[in-house]
Swiss-Prot record:
Xref: PANTHER family: CBB3-TYPE CYTOCHROME C OXIDASE SUBUNIT FIXP
InterPro entries: CcoP_N (IPR032858), CcoP_N_sf (IPR038414), Cyt_c-like_dom (IPR009056), Cyt_c-like_dom_sf (IPR036909), Cyt_c_oxidase_cbb3_su3 (IPR004678), Cytochrome_c_Oxidase_Subunit (IPR050597)
PROSITE patterns with a match to the protein in the record: CYTC (PS51007)
GO biological process: oxidative phosphorylation; proton transmembrane transport
A GO CC term attached to the entry: plasma membrane
Family listed: Belongs to the CcoP / FixP family.
Phylogenetic lineage: Bacteria, Pseudomonadati, Campylobacterota, Epsilonproteobacteria, Campylobacterales
Binding annotation for heme c 2: M174, C219, C222, H223
Pathway connected to this protein: Energy metabolism; oxidative phosphorylation
Keywords assigned: Cell inner membrane, Cell membrane, Electron transport, Heme, Hydrogen ion transport, Ion transport, Iron, Membrane, Metal-binding, Oxidoreductase, Repeat, Respiratory chain, Transmembrane, Transmembrane helix, Transport
Subunit organization: Component of the cbb3-type cytochrome c oxidase at least composed of CcoN, CcoO, CcoQ and CcoP.
Membrane topology: Multi-pass membrane protein
Protein name per Swiss-Prot or TrEMBL: Cbb3-type cytochrome c oxidase subunit CcoP
Length: 292
């Protein structure tokens, strides 16, 4: 009898019993009337008359009127008092439950070390990301982003070489730039060391040259001198200050991203917690690209 603990089930059971009783009552009344009553009353003027059978000018039965009135009253109660419009949705309930779970999840795992974060991120990657990016995260021969290189200098070099479909920024798609590998590496070194919050590069000797190229090759035209991609307080291009960080990854997970093959959908519906996004970012950063 656990189902009686839910007031909706109780309400439905009572309503079903009421309907059953009324049905039995009305059915018995009609059967009795059909058996005992005689034709009487006035026929409607200009009413239907078929084979000598006419249509009486009777009033609407009391039972019908009562049914109509009860239905109207019930509908009014249902929409304005019982379950007001927009007061509840299954999606909203799901989101609230996930939010509560994420709070417990983060409280439980808030003191994870670096290795544990990477392990957690690997688990998230294998469940949600490996189908497109591959078990090795190398992008399945170009069908998806190579995450071994993404978020690092190698990822910037790939973007310079091949361009980027982007994330529906006002600047549109970024075209490929005609730069040799050395110049691309210099720009990547400058971005990772001076613009990105990562503040780290494997080639510190190329930072100054990278800055010159970043300004002279037109990168500032879209990304701005500070790399934030803002123009007139609008997001015009990718924010390079967040490149390689969990904030950049969170933006992609929230909005999705165009690719050369297909389109990465938004993962906003997954309701990843901040800790899960951080763990996934740590895992991606732990992947070591091969030297070109």
């Amino acid at each position: 009898m656990d189902f009686l603990n839910d007031h909706i089930n109780v309400f439905g059971l009572i309503a079903a019993l009421v309907i059953l009783v009324l049905t039995i009552y009305e059915s018995s009344s009609l059967i009795k009337e059909m058996r005992d009553s005689k034709s009487q009353g006035e026929l409607m003027e200009n009413g239907h008359l078929i084979d000598g059978i006419g249509e009486f000018a009777n009033n609407v039965p009391v039972g019908w009127i009562a049914s109509f009135m009860c239905t109207i009253v019930w509908a009014f109660w249902y929409f304005f008092f019982g379950y007001p419009l927009n007061s509840f949705s299954q999606i909203g309930q799901y989101n609230e439950e996930v939010k509560a779970h994420n709070q417990k999840f983060e409280a439980k795992w808030k003191n994870l070390g670096q290795k544990e974060l990477v392990d957690m991120g690997q688990g998230i990657f294998l469940v949600h990301c490996s189908q497109c990016h591959g078990i090795t995260a190398e992008g399945l021969h170009g069908s998806a982003q190579n995450l071994v290189r993404w978020g690092k200098e190698e990822g910037i070099m790939d973007t310079i070489k091949h361009g980027s479909k982007g994330m529906d920024y006002l600047a549109g798609e970024m075209p490929a730039m005609e730069l040799d590998e050395k110049d691309a590496k210099a720009i990547a070194s400058y971005v990772m060391a001076e613009i990105s919050s990562v503040k780290k590069t494997k080639n510190p000797q190329l930072i100054d040259k990278g800055k010159e190229l970043f300004e002279s090759m037109g990168c500032t035209g879209c990304h701005g001198n500070d790399g934030k991609g803002l123009q007139e307080n609008q997001v015009f291009a990718a924010d390079l200050t967040a490149y390689g960080t969990e904030n950049f990854l969170r933006n992609i997970l929230t909005h999705g991203k165009k690719g050369n093959i297909g389109h990465m959908p938004s993962f906003k519906y997954k309701n990843f917690s901040d800790l899960q996004v951080k763990a996934l970012a740590e895992f991606i950063q732990s992947l070591k690209p091969l030297e070109d």
